[in-house]
């Protein structure tokens, strides 16, 4: 017997809210992401990359990047324990699962292994404007080739993929550098400790934001910002500071070859720097053979990515489009993707160095950037044709009409609410329907249908009513024989 105190609280109503950092997506966003992925996937497959999908969860020790606490490894990731008391975590990118997959299946994989993947990833980080805890990522990698030409193909594929996704030539660029050049520079500049090297690279990474003078201060004793906060510098002395600044400014408007010449003069005498220079030269040669011009991909010595991750070439995709938000304010998207060579990731599993290189971008971020530039991915929304309902007794006729349209490949629906004519028209408009189909008793008896062209109404509302030829071509409402329904609707949709 249940007491009153044990009765469930039927008055409780949970608040309808999404968790912080997670967003619902409606058709517009999903259509945009699908269009981008279809376009990019077609490019990647032309390059001989095969699709791969791995599970949302990996064992936490396989991820490796976020493991501060062996008792509860959930810093940066969403983790849980399974029934075997093993920690699992939602993947935070698509590269770590690839490394696990490659190590697990290495003996049976074709080598080099070329794959691309896309899907949701999760980050247990503080959310903010435009920063979500779940987002769609697209990733392409070659595992098992140490050739710089493998890096070049990834870069070329990224260039073509972004163009196919809706960024015409001149609206985005791939910037290329090499960690070995940076390491050689650090040695030549006398940066001895790991902390000092990290401070130098972090200073270089701020070149776009602080300019040469600001970076000079951070390379030296430090910098006092506008708020009065002091950032301790790397502690380099005069000549070493000049050497670093000469390197990061070695980029040339004369193209990749001219930049390589400039870099060679700065890093001369460094064995690791010379190795990085040779790799960049081979990347440049391969890109030229692949038809990738200097305005599509260029060498930028100031690019610093993945300070403890990348081992060779690094690259970053930067958006050059002028973008605005919904209020018309200018918005800077900056980097929209990046990648590079990471020869140590698979070795975590095998103990053997396995060369790898790849590129990834955030699909949702790219869709937002395209939209901010006035380029709607996937095209404008187009809802279904809506069949208006007048009388329950005629439901068979309504479904016959909607079936006729669907059989012809036209998206259509019967209105299944209980509202009258005016609310039904408003519903069709909110759905983005190109047209509505009406069958009253008179039309049914006469074997006709009435079609109202909602696209025509929308265009008229935008001030296009003076276009007499257009109005004659697409009358706002017409009654036609029922056997002409499909052709008439197709004419409206094809407009």
Curated annotation (Swiss-Prot):
HAMAP family in alphabetical order: His_tRNA_synth (MF_00127)
Name the enzyme group at the top EC level: ligase
Q: What's one Pfam family the UniProt record gives for this protein?
A: HGTP_anticodon
Extent of Basic and acidic residues compositional bias: 12-24
Q: What is the reaction catalyzed?
A: tRNA(His) + L-histidine + ATP = L-histidyl-tRNA(His) + AMP + diphosphate + H(+)
Q: How does it assemble?
A: Homodimer.
Q: In its UniProt entry, what is this protein called? A: Histidine--tRNA ligase
């Amino acid at each position: 017997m249940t007491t009153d105190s044990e009765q469930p609280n039927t008055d409780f109503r949970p608040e309808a809210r999404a968790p912080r950092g997670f967003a619902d997506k409606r058709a517009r966003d999903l259509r945009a992401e699908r269009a981008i992925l279809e376009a990019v996937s077609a490019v990647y497959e032309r390059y001989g990359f095969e699709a791969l999908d791995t599970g949302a969860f990996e064992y936490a020790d396989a991820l490796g990047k976020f493991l501060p606490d062996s008792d509860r490894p959930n810093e940066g990731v969403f983790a849980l324990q399974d029934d075997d008391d093993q920690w699992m975590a939602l993947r935070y990118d698509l590269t770590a699962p690839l490394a696990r997959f490659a190590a697990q299946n290495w003996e049976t994989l074709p080598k080099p292994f070329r794959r691309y993947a896309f899907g949701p990833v999760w980050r247990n980080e503080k959310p903010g404007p435009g920063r979500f805890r779940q987002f769609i990522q697209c990733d392409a990698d070659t595992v098992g080739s140490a050739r710089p030409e493998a890096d070049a193909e990834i870069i070329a594929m990224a260039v073509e993929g972004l163009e196919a996704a809706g960024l015409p030539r001149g609206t985005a660029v791939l910037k290329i550098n090499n960690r070995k050049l940076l390491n050689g520079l650090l040695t030549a500049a006398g940066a001895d400790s790991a902390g000092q090297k990290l401070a130098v690279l972090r200073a270089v990474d701020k070149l776009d934001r602080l300019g040469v003078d600001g970076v000079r201060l951070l390379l030296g004793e430090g910098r006092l910002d506008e708020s009065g906060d002091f950032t301790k510098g790397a502690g380099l002395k005069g000549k070493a500071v000049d050497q670093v600044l000469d390197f990061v400014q070695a980029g040339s408007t004369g193209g990749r070859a001219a930049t390589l010449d400039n870099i060679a003069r700065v890093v001369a005498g460094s064995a690791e720097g010379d190795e990085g220079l040779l790799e960049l030269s081979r990347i440049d040669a391969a890109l030229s053979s692949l038809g990738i011009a200097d305005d599509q991909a260029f060498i930028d010595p100031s690019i610093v990515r993945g300070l403890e991750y990348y081992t060779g070439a690094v690259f970053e995709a930067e958006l050059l489009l002028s973008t605005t938000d919904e209020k018309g304010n200018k918005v800077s998207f900056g980097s929209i993707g990046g990648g590079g060579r990471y020869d140590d990731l698979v070795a975590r599993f095998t103990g053997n160095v396995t060369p790898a290189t790849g590129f990834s971008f955030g699909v949702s971020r790219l869709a937002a950037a395209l939209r901010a530039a006035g380029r709607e991915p996937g095209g404008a929304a187009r809802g279904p044709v809506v069949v208006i309902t007048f009388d329950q007794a005629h439901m068979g006729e309504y479904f016959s009409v909607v079936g006729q349209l669907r059989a012809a490949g036209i998206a259509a629906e019967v209105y299944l609410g209980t509202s009258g004519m005016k609310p039904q028209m408003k519903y069709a408009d909110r759905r983005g329907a190109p047209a509505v189909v009406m069958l009253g008793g008179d039309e049914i008896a006469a074997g006709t249908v009435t079609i109202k062209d909602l696209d025509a109404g929308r265009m008229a509302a935008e001030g296009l009513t003076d276009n007499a030829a257009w109005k004659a071509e697409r009358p706002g409402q017409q009654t036609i024989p029922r056997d002409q329904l499909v052709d008439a609707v197709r004419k409206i949709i094809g407009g």
